[in-house]
From Swiss-Prot:
In-chain residues carrying the UniProt-annotated modification Phosphothreonine: T15
Membrane topology annotation: Multi-pass membrane protein
Major location (coarse): plastid
Name of the protein: Photosystem II CP43 reaction center protein
Similarity comment: family membership: Belongs to the PsbB/PsbC family. PsbC subfamily.
Length: 473
């Protein structure tokens, strides 16, 4: 019987398939992988694998540019950004481009420029991808040894890791430069309802920056997600950028220690599994960051957070009923607790009613009304500004709830709008992608470990029913 898998040790795990289908001269017989296994056929062809990666980058950048221009074409400056189904423009606005006081979009030309630059970049990447996939050398080791590699070469692998870390660090410093020198970034906490400003004094104190990592993730603590000022965010990027760059230099100059050589599996599929695990972790952290944090993801662009929409509703009705003569400090609700305001178990004055569970919300439209012991009753009576009323009324009807068929908002809220918050989309997509990346990590880690242990052939396939069936083609 014909052998249905490659006997070469360098292709450790195969999936059985119709071996007669050939694609570009790289069929299952010669590579051990079927056509649909995609880049697995290129594991030992560094030149072709480079082409696949560059072309993939071109597709990503093309999508970014095309979607960017699509959003610019559909953008209505008179409506809130978060009401228009935009997923890219909020990021550009957060970086301070085209934004005026209060988060108002005053100029869409920078967004157009961004889209065009991405399209041009995608053309360059696309050309490079096609060149390396079809024309360039199959392997780089002979012609361009600097770019060549062997997956087992531990020293070369950590050198490549170091180069990647330096590039990541440079990326972190791009945000730092934008915030410090090139026009600043949007600060939702700027007085009067947010504005673009330069961050002149980033936090560099290590106890402040790394203190976030030591915080509890629960309640009012909130781990790194609790960061609520741009000084700490930009200072954190200074620290992370520096750590990435110095770590990259370290990995380029050193060889892996003996314990690391023993602990890790050193194969292409193992590196894939490590990368998927890291991306999965990033996805889960980003999910929480987007959902709860309104400093890095300003509500003016992404819509309010869940707690923010809830507290905004309590605030809106407090303002209304206070105007109608209600004594908001003493009025009781149906449970005997305060209808508008109540005391938390530790004595702070917080909003009453169902929103009491969101007592730890911090939002720029609400913080000016706090005193040393929670909400300040005299400020609530005398100091509420029109912009605070307008913003809370807007946020009240734009809770980040909704389903994929775009029926959004609070089900019981008669003023809710038919929309899905970009905050919901961004948070949910990162959770779902993070989950699937984690499954991919388990899958590829299992295969890589099995190959390293030498039992990669799996169960005996001699009596598999599919072997007696007619080939698909």
């Amino acid at each position: 019987m014909k052998t249905l898998y490659s006997l070469r040790r360098s292709y450790p795990v195969e999936t059985l398939f119709n071996g007669t289908i050939a694609l570009a001269g790289r069929d299952q017989e010669t590579t051990g992988f079927a056509w649909w296994a995609g880049n697995a056929r290129l594991i030992n062809l560094s030149g072709k694998l480079l082409g696949a990666h560059v072309a993939h980058a071109g597709l990503i950048v093309f999508w970014a540019g095309a979607m960017n221009l699509f959003e610019v074409a559909h953008f209505v400056p008179e409506k809130p950004m978060y009401e228009q189904g935009l997923i890219l423009l909020p990021h550009l606005a957060t970086l301070g481009w085209g934004v005026g006081p209060g988060g108002e979009i005053v100029d869409t030309f920078p967004y157009f420029v961004s889209g065009v630059l991405h399209l041009i970049s995608s053309a360059v990447l696309g050309f490079g991808g096609i060149y390396h996939a079809l024309i360039g050398p199959e392997t780089l080791e002979e012609s361009f040894p600097f770019f060549g590699y062997v997956w087992k070469d531990r020293n070369k692998m950590t050198t490549i890791l170091g180069i990647h870390l330096i590039l990541l660090g440079a990326g972190a410093f791009l945000l730092v430069l934008k915030a410090l020198y090139f026009g600043g970034v949007y600060d939702t906490w700027a007085p009067g309802g947010g504005d673009v400003r330069k961050i002149t004094n980033p936090t560099l104190n290590p106890s402040a920056i790394f203190g976030y990592l030591l915080k509890s993730p629960f309640g009012g603590e909130g781990w790194i997600v609790s960061v609520d000022n741009l000084e700490d965010i930009i200072g954190g990027h200074v620290w992370l950028g520096s750590i990435c760059i110095f770590g990259g230099i370290w990995h380029i100059l050193t060889k892996p220690f003996a314990w690391a050589r023993r602990a890790f599996v050193w194969s292409g599929e193992a590196y894939l599994s490590y990368s998927l695990a890291a991306l999965s972790l990033f996805g889960f952290i980003a999910c929480c960051f987007v959902w709860f944090n309104n400093t890095a993801y300003p509500s003016e662009f992404y819509g309010p957070t869940g707690p923010e929409a809830s507290q905004a509703q309590a605030f809106t009705f407090l303002v209304r009923d206070q105007r109608l003569g209600a004594s908001v400090g003493s009025a009781q609700g149906p449970t005997g607790l305060g209808k508008y305001l109540m005391r938390s178990p530790t004595g702070e004055i917080i909003f009453g009613g169902e929103t009491m569970r969101f007592w730890d919300l911090r939002a720029p439209w609400l913080e000016p009304l706090r005193g040393p012991n929670g909400l300040d009753l005299s400020k609530l009576r005398k100091d509420i500004q029109p912009w605070q009323e307008r913003r809370s009324a807007e946020y009240m009807t734009h809770a980040p709830l909704g389903s994929s068929n775009s029926v959004g908002g609070v089900a019981t809220e008669i003023n809710a709008v038919n929309y899905v918050s970009p905050r919901s989309w961004l948070s949910t997509s990162h959770f779902v992608l993070g989950f699937f990346l984690f499954i991919g990590h388990l899958w590829h880690a299992g295969r890589a470990r099995a190959a390293a242990a030498g039992f990669e052939k799996g169960i005996d396939r001699d009596f598999e029913p599919v072997l007696s069936m007619t080939p698909l083609n």
